[in-house]
Regions:
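Structural transition elements
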Residues: 244, 370-403, 418-425
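A structural "hinge/loop" feature
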Residues: 91-109, 131, 158, 212-222, ...
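Gly/Pro-rich hinge or "lid" segments in bacterial periplasmic/extracellular proteins
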Residues: 122-126, 217-280, 289, 395, ...
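Detector for C-terminal structural segments
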Residues: 14, 20, 31-46, 250-254, ...
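N-terminal lobe/hinge region of extracytoplasmic solute-binding protein
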Residues: 90-139, 170, 239
Length: 573
C-alpha cells in the first residue's frame, strides 16, 4: 500500500531557491512557507538543507501536548511544572459584547482563555494551526481548505464542527455586525463562498488571491464562538473551547476566569491544561502609577501593555522580569478627510511637516523606538521598503497652508487619552514645534475609556495601533472602503484612495517578497504624500511581570497566550 503524499504549494521550492541565493532571509522563508501550508518542522528542514523540497504534510497542529506555538520552559530546566495558583493582571476592563466588534487587544485578552482561534501567530510571527489541524491552498491562492482538529469539545460537551466555523464567518462578513474583520476580507470573500465540505472541513473560495488568510484568522476579534452564541460574550452562558471558563465580568472593575474540566490539550505532566487555577484581570483606572505601585506591592503579577513611563520606573527593579519586544506598535495621528480643513491634502501635509521627529521621540518616548515616515508600514514588516525620514519643515508647512488659503495660525484640537502619557507628550511637543509652522494646537484630553468611545469619530486624534506581522494585514483594516465606497469600520480617517486600494489588493496576493516590497514602495509613497496620517515614531514595547510565573512570555501584539503559564513555588513570595 503506497504512503499518502500531501501536496506542497509550487512556490515553496521556488522560494527555497531564493533562500539559497540570499534573496530572502530564513525568517521570511519560514513565514511564507508556513502560510502556504507547510508545517513548521518541515519548513525548518527545508530552510536548513537546501535540497529540493520533498512531498511534505501540510501545516498541521502538533500533538495535544505541548500546545501549538507554546513557549514552555522545559521541565528539566525548572524542576517540574506545578499546578495551582491565580495570576493577577493589571488591565482596564471596558464594556464589550460581541468579540467580532473588539476594538482593542485587551478586549480579546480578557476572554482569550475562554474562547480560541482557528490559527495562532506566535511571538516569532509564524502562524500555526490551532483549532485547525491544517490548511491547504491552491496554486493561485484563491481556494483555501481549512480542516478542523477532530474531538475538540466545547465546555457544554458539544463537538467543534464546520457548523461553528460557518456561523462565525457569517457573523464576521455580515455588514450589520460592524466588525473590523470585514475589512480584511473586503474584495476577497463573501459569506456565500464559505462552504462546509464535511463535518470538519471548510472551504473559502476567494474572488482574488490572498496570501495572509491564516494570519487573518488570528485577527484578535476572530475568536470562535459556539453556533448558539447569544450575541453577548459577557453573560457567562456561552460555551467556549478554551482552558478556562468565565466567572465574572464587571465593567471598570474586573474579569475573572477559572480552570474548567475537559480541555482538549494536555500539559507536560499528561493532564489537561491549564496549570493555573485561574486569572483575575483587575482594572486599576487610567493612571499607570497605580499599576506600578500594585505590581511592586505584589497586588498584581503583570501589567498589560506598560507605558514607557512604567518601563522607566521598573526597568531596574530586581524583583521583576522586564523583556523588550520587537513590534510594529505605533501611535497614529489621523485626520478625518471628510471634515474641513482636512479634505485638503495640503493642510494634511502641513500638519505632518511640523513634526520634529527626533525631538518627539526623545520627549514622548525617551528615545525608545525608531523614527516614522507618515505611513503605516513598519521597518519590522518583511515587505517594508526603506524610505528617507521626513525633516521638520515649519516654513514648508506655512507655505502649504498659504497655498490652501487657510488663515494662520490654524486652530487644531487633537483628542488624546491621558492614560497614554507618551501620546500627551507627543502632542504637547507638536504644539510647541507647530507654532513656527502656522498652527495653534490644543489638546482635547480625556480618560482612555472616553477616547475608546469616540476614536473613530473625533476630527483629529491619536490612536494606538497594535502590531500586525504583515503590512498587508494592517493597511486593509484602516485605509480602504467596501465595494460601495463606504469606509471600513476601522477606517477612522475615512481616507480612501483608488490607486492605493488597487495596489494593496495586488500586494495581498503577491507571493514573491521582492515583488511585494516593490508594490509596498509605491503604497508607502502614496500614503506619505497624500494620506491621512502622521507617524512620528515606532514604539519599543515591554513585557513586565513577576518571575514566579513561568511561561508568561512576551508577544509583539501583547496577546496573552497563557494556557501553559504556571506558578513556580520556589520563587513565590
Amino acid at each position: 500500500m503506497s504512503e499518502r503524499r500531501d501536496r506542497v504549494h509550487p512556490y515553496v521550492p521556488e522560494m527555497q531557491e531564493q533562500l539559497r541565493q540570499g534573496r530572502v532571509s530564513r525568517r521570511e522563508f519560514l513565514r511564507v512557507a508556513t502560510l502556504l501550508g507547510v508545517s513548521l518542522p518541515v519548513a525548518n528542514l527545508l530552510a536548513a538543507c537546501g535540497a529540493a523540497p520533498p512531498a511534505a504534510a501540510p501545516a498541521a497542529a502538533p500533538a495535544a501536548a505541548p500546545a501549538p506555538g507554546a513557549t514552555a520552559v522545559p521541565a528539566a530546566a525548572s524542576g517540574a511544572v506545578t499546578r495551582g495558583g491565580v495570576l493577577k493582571v493589571g488591565i482596564q476592563v471596558p464594556a464589550v459584547d460581541h468579540p467580532a466588534r473588539f476594538s482593542w487587544v485587551f478586549d480579546s485578552n480578557e476572554f482569550r482563555q475562554v474562547y480560541e482561534y482557528l490559527t495562532e501567530t506566535g511571538a516569532d510571527n509564524i502562524t500555526r494551526p490551532y483549532l485547525l489541524e491544517k490548511w491547504e491552498v491552491n496554486d493561485t491562492l484563491d481556494l483555501w481548505t481549512l480542516t478542523l482538529r477532530q474531538g475538540i469539545k466545547w465546555s457544554n460537551g458539544d463537538e467543534l464542527t464546520s457548523e461553528d466555523v460557518l456561523f462565525n464567518f457569517k457573523e464576521w462578513l455580515t455588514p450589520e455586525t460592524k466588525s473590523s474583520i470585514l475589512g480584511l476580507w473586503e474584495g476577497f470573500l463573501t459569506v456565500d463562498n464559505v462552504t462546509a465540505v464535511d463535518t470538519y472541513t471548510v472551504q473559502l473560495k476567494l474572488d482574488a488571491p490572498k496570501l495572509d488568510v491564516p494570519e487573518t484568522l488570528f485577527h484578535y476579534p476572530a475568536q470562535i464562538m459556539h453556533r448558539s452564541f447569544n450575541g453577548d460574550l459577557t453573560t457567562l452562558t456561552n460555551p467556549g473551547t478554551g482552558p478556562m471558563k468565565l466567572d465574572a465580568f464587571v465593567v471598570g472593575e474586573r474579569v475573572t476566569v477559572s480552570k474548567r474540566d475537559g480541555y482538549w490539550q494536555d500539559g507536560s505532566d499528561g493532564s489537561p491544561l491549564p496549570y493555573l487555577d485561574g486569572i483575575e484581570y483587575l482594572d486599576l483606572g487610567n493612571d499607570q502609577t497605580a499599576y506600578v505601585a500594585a505590581l511592586q506591592a505584589g497586588q498584581i503579577d503583570t501589567i498589560y501593555d506598560p507605558t514607557v513611563d512604567t518601563f522607566l520606573a521598573l526597568r531596574n527593579d530586581a524583583a521583576l522580569t522586564v523583556e523588550p519586544i520587537a513590534t510594529s506598535q505605533v501611535r497614529v495621528l489621523r485626520m478625518r478627510v471628510d471634515q474641513e480643513p482636512w479634505t485638503d491634502v495640503k493642510v494634511r501635509n502641513a500638519l505632518k511637516k511640523i513634526q520634529n521627529r527626533e525631538s518627539i521621540l526623545e520627549k514622548a518616548y525617551f528615545g525608545q523606538g525608531v523614527l516614522g515616515h507618515d505611513m503605516h508600514v513598519s521597518p519590522v514588516h518583511p515587505e517594508y521598503a526603506p524610505m528617507e525620514v521626513p525633516a521638520y519643515d515649519p516654513e514648508g508647512a506655512k507655505a502649504l497652508l498659504t497655498e490652501a488659503g487657510v488663515q494662520q495660525p490654524l486652530d487644531v484640537a487633537i483628542s488624546v487619552g491621558t492614560g497614554w502619557t507618551d501620546i500627551v507628550a507627543y502632542i504637547e511637543t507638536l504644539a510647541e514645534d507647530g507654532k513656527a509652522g502656522g498652527f495653534n494646537i490644543t489638546l482635547d484630553t480625556m480618560p482612555n475609556a472616553s477616547y475608546w468611545e469616540k476614536w473613530t469619530e473625533t476630527p483629529v486624534g491619536v490612536t494606538p495601533w497594535t502590531h500586525r506581522p504583515l503590512a498587508v494585514m494592517v493597511l486593509p483594516l484602516a485605509y480602504i472602503a467596501d465595494k460601495d465606497g463606504v469606509p471600513m469600520p476601522w477606517n477612522e480617517s475615512r481616507w480612501v484612495d483608488e490607486e492605493f486600494s488597487t495596489l494593496l489588493k495586488q500586494a495581498q496576493g503577491t507571493l514573491d517578497i521582492e515583488a511585494r516590497r516593490a508594490i509596498m514602495k509605491d503604497l508607502q509613497a502614496i500614503q506619505q504624500t497624500r494620506g491621512s496620517i502622521a507617524v512620528a515614531w515606532w514604539q519599543s514595547v515591554w513585557n513586565i511581570y513577576h518571575p514566579r510565573f513561568q511561561n508568561l512570555s512576551a508577544h509583539p501584539t501583547h496577546y496573552h497566550l497563557w494556557r501553559e503559564v504556571w506558578l513556580d513555588p520556589s520563587k513565590a513570595t
